[in-house]
Amino acid sequence: MPKRKSNKRKTKRRIKNKKTLPLDLKSLGNDISKYPFVAIEWLDIEGDSGWSDTRALNKLKLPICVSKGYLVSQKKGITRIFTDFIKTKDKETFDSIGNTTIIPTSVIQSIKKLS
């Protein structure tokens, strides 16, 4: 007697994307409390100009860097953050930002919301 196929659906396990966070760019404005403060772990380039051999080169690992800041956007393969801002007088908003960083999203290992 032939085996019957099970009618159970196989559910695909969703893998949580660790490289991006959902962000509503239109609602951010200049209210600092609306910007998520994040820690981003990302892979950097490693180089050495000295003499070596291929075995040593094959053992090298990429350094993992950590950047923390206010997440501005993640679009077109680029993640943008800033760490400093100038407060607006008498309001919880900001006029200008400083210490900006842009990171290729493809090198991000993880991004975590800190607050």
Predicted regions and their residues:
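Conserved RNA-binding domains used in RNP assembly and mRNA/RNA metabolism
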Residues: 2-115
